[in-house]
Structures are given as C-alpha cells and as structure tokens.
Amino acid sequence: MIKQNNKYWLPLIAVIFWGASFIATKYLLDELTPETIISLRLIFAILLLSGIAIVQKRDFSINLKSHGYIFLLALIAVFHLWIQVTGLKFTTASNTGWIIGTAPIFMALLGLIFFNEKLSAIKIIGIIVAVIGLLLLVGKGNPTNIDLIENKGDLLVLSSSFTWGIYSMVNKKISLTYSPLMTILYLFIMMAIIIVPITVNDTVIKSVYNLTITGWISILFLGLLCSGVAYVIWAYSLREMESAKVGAYLYFEPFVTVLTAWLFLNENITVLMILSGLIITAGVFLVNKDW
C-alpha cells in the first residue's frame, strides 16, 4: 500500500515522463519514421500493460458491442499521435510542450459547438488569453510572422491538440465499463492493429535493426514508462485523489519539457518563450476552472 503522503508525488512522476516524452521522440525522429515510433511505442506498452493485467488476474473478456467504440477512439488516437510526432519533426520540443497544453481550449469549443455546453465569460477570456500566448509563441513575438510553411511543425502540433479535443469529447460520450487499465490496454491493442500493418516493410525492419543505443533507450522510455507506467500511475491517482487535484499536475508538463529539452537537446530557453508559455498556461487555467 502506498503511504498517504507519497501518493501526491505519483501524478508528478507521470507528468515528468510525459513532459520528457517529446525529447525522446525528437531523438528517435533522426532514426525512425513517425509511424515506426508510434508502432514500437504501442508494442512495448501493450507488453507491459498485458503483464500487469495478468499479474493482477484481470478479466480479458470484452463485450463485442464495445469493439466499434474502441475502434473509433483508436482511429482518432492514431491520427492524433501521427500529426503530433510529424509536427515535432519540424519544430522544437519546447514549443510542442506549450502547444499541446492548449487541448482544453479545443475541448471547450467543441463542447459548445456539438453538445451545447455553455462557456462563461471567464472561460471566453481564458480562450482569448491562450490564443494571444499561442500567437506570440508561434510568431516569435510577432503574430504577422506566422507562415504555413515555416511554422508547419507548430501548426501540426496545434492540430494534434484539436484532435485530442475530439478524442476527449468522443471518449466522454462513450460509456465503457472496463477498468482504466483494461480500457487503455484494449485501446492500445486496437491502435496497434490499425497502424502496425501499414508501417512494417523491409526498410522499417532494417531501421529498427540498426537502431542505436540512444534510440532503444528512447523507445523503451516511451513505451514502458510514458505509455505504460505513467498511465497506470495516473489511473491510480484518479482513484485515490480528487480529479481536479490530479489534473492540476498537468500544468507542470510544459515546464518539464522545456527543462529537459534544454538539458538533452540544447534548446534555448528565451524570455519570450517563457512569457508566451505562461500566458498560454494562464488562459488554459481560466478555461479549466469551474467558475
């Protein structure tokens, strides 16, 4: 049993893994295609989560009616990851960390459009504030500098925030009766079924065979820790703590990304980037808060 005080550190561990995941992915993009990275990440995560499920003697039976729902979520999740990883090829890990954090903005807007969920005045202000921060970040201080070609990486990552908003909306409306562990395991299996067959070829097999030590460390980190351990920790934390308290830890994720990108990728930490990031975070905070 985890001590009462120690449980508050667990969500932070998950957030540290997720924040550092962009650095590991950035390393891998020098050796593998986005599709290969996603496929390997899923395979290692499935192996770990299956092992945990077996040790815990979980029920692996699945309701056939759930297949369509899980397939839909998996399809969205695969596309989300693909444009995120592809975008990371053309932008910095630091920018990616800040931009990914805007997903709640899209969730709020999609909730308004499709489910008539009301936006308070403060939430609208939060959206405006976050957009200002985004424009400053992507435009490097001048929104008129934003170019579809030059900033394609940032814009692809932003698109992945939008797809995560769609995923969250669909997930919210779908009622699945499985435990968090089995839900994420079934989702990963379905995602692997979608992406692995269209990824594997002779060139991919050769690139995996020639993967460097750094590459293997990176893919194991992504699969076992970021997609495996972190999800288990997060599910445990949500069960043991209030959702709002657990969710608050996510505000630290971009700061972890910026710090680890500086340490391992030699990315610069500029005043403008930190200021833009803080503005984005403030806007997202206003949107997330129940006023």
Roles of regions detected by a PLM:
Residues 1-36, 147-173, 193-195:
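Glycine-/small-residue-enriched transmembrane alpha-helix faces in small-molecule transporters
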Residues 17, 21-22, 50-100, 136, ...:
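Specific transmembrane alpha-helical segments of multi-pass solute transporters/efflux pumps
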Residues 17-46, 92-95, 166-190, 205-208:
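Juxtamembrane helix-loop-helix junctions in multi-pass membrane proteins
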Residues 28, 37, 41, 87, ...:
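Hydrophobic/aromatic residues within transmembrane alpha-helices
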Residues 38-40, 82, 96-102, 170-192, ...:
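Helix-helix packing/entry segments at the starts of transmembrane helices
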Residues 48-57, 103-128, 254-275:
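C-terminal transmembrane-helix exit sites in multi-pass transporters
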Residues 49, 71, 122-140, 195, ...:
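Hydrophobic transmembrane alpha-helices of multi-pass small-molecule transport proteins
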Residues 49, 107-109, 113, 145-204, ...:
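Transmembrane alpha-helical segments that form core, pore/gating elements
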